[in-house]
Amino acid sequence: MDLAMGEKNMPKILINSVPKSGTNLLVQIIKGIPGIFQDQKVFYQSENYLKVLDIKPGELVSSHIPKNEEFSRQLKSHSIKQLFIYRDLRDIAVSLVYFINNKLHDHPLFPVFQKRILTFEEQLNTVICGIELIGDEKNNKYGIERYPGVFHEYLPIYKWKDDPTICSMRFEDLVCNENSKDIEILKIIDFLWEDLGYLKMDKYHLLNMMKQNINPEKSWTYRKGLIGNWRNEFTADNKNKFKEVTGEFLIKYGYEKNNDW
């Protein structure tokens, strides 16, 4: 069987994610499928979201698209399979502080962290709570005058989790151990195909091919990819600020049973 790019039986795949939730890990896993290709890397700007609908069989794109019922219906009508990955927002907040300081220098908070908010604790509170930008900080490429905080910025993306038309997964389940990783990847395979016959392999052979394509060192955004590293970084004040801003968010998304963490 010729598995040339665009083979008509191949799925059209959108990887949608909360930023800093293992987007590139999931991309590597999916690119381990024979015949999957990625011509255009990302569709992160809002004006590009509808271009996702034009992807071809076998094509993979990734983005950070907020939940939208009409877009969900359009994906279904275009036979596009959405894989959605999310992560503990506390680990995302910590990761984002490091990412802004070390690599993402066009982020609106980079000049804030360079000149105004200097300690890690204060920077983490800024990512959690948001901040009004002042002076030259307003001259950012996004044209914003206030950074809203990671909760308010990303909550509309998290809301995809309960969409019944997609395959939703937690970053933690892809990395915590081999058994849970296998369960998640097999879930992806079952979501993408009803019948693997034309690939001339069974799902466990495909599972191993997908796992063998994982290489964190190839990811520009990769730092540690740890689970629960927030415990080493959050101060008591960070915890209080997070609870004030997010309410019962962690409980709803299965990361805590109550707010006594």
Regions found by a protein language model. Give the residues of each.
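PAPS-dependent sulfotransferase catalytic domain
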Residues: M1-M169, V245, Y253-N258
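A short acidic, often aromatic-flanked loop/helix-cap motif at beta-alpha or helix-coil junctions
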Residues: N68-E70, L174-N177
